[in-house]
């Protein structure tokens, strides 16, 4: 009796193990972090877009730089500055918080968070 159940359950258990192996996630590819020169050039290009007044393209460029360089605070603080200057205080605070995750002592990000919060509070009272 036990032997027949074991014979029936063994192929089923094997099939479940095979299916579980198929459902597992593939091994993640190693993230390629750009060199310091590529990072500096990308930042300079985004800065040029911002200086030319093309803030939307600059923010997109900074966000791409942030994705490519996840430990760097600079692109996030640049996005925060642009959002703050445009009066998008909530977005500026979010970007400043991203900066502070990477550089807890960044004064620019702390200022944007504090002043942006105050300006949002004033708006809510108007």
Model-derived regions, located:
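Canonical tetratricopeptide repeat
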Residues: 78, 112-113
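Canonical positions in the second alpha-helix
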Residues: 64-65, 98-99
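Bacterial Sec signal peptide processing site at the extreme N-terminus
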Residues: 16-40
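Helix-start (N-cap) detector for alpha-helical repeat units in TPR-like alpha-solenoids
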Residues: 39, 73-74, 107-108
């Amino acid at each position: 009796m036990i032997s027949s159940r074991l014979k029936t359950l063994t192929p089923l258990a094997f099939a479940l193990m095979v299916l579980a192996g198929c459902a597992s996630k593939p091994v993640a590819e190693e993230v390629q972090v750009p060199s310091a020169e590529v990072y500096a050039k990308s930042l300079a290009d985004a800065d040029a877009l911002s200086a030319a007044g093309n803030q939307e393209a600059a923010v997109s460029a900074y966000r791409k730089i942030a994705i490519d360089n996840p430990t760097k605070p600079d692109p996030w603080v640049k996005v925060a500055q642009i959002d703050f200057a445009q009066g998008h205080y909530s977005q500026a605070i979010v970007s400043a918080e991203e900066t502070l995750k990477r550089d807890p002592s960044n004064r620019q990000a702390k200022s944007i968070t504090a002043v942006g919060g105050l300006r949002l509070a004033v708006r809510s009272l108007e």
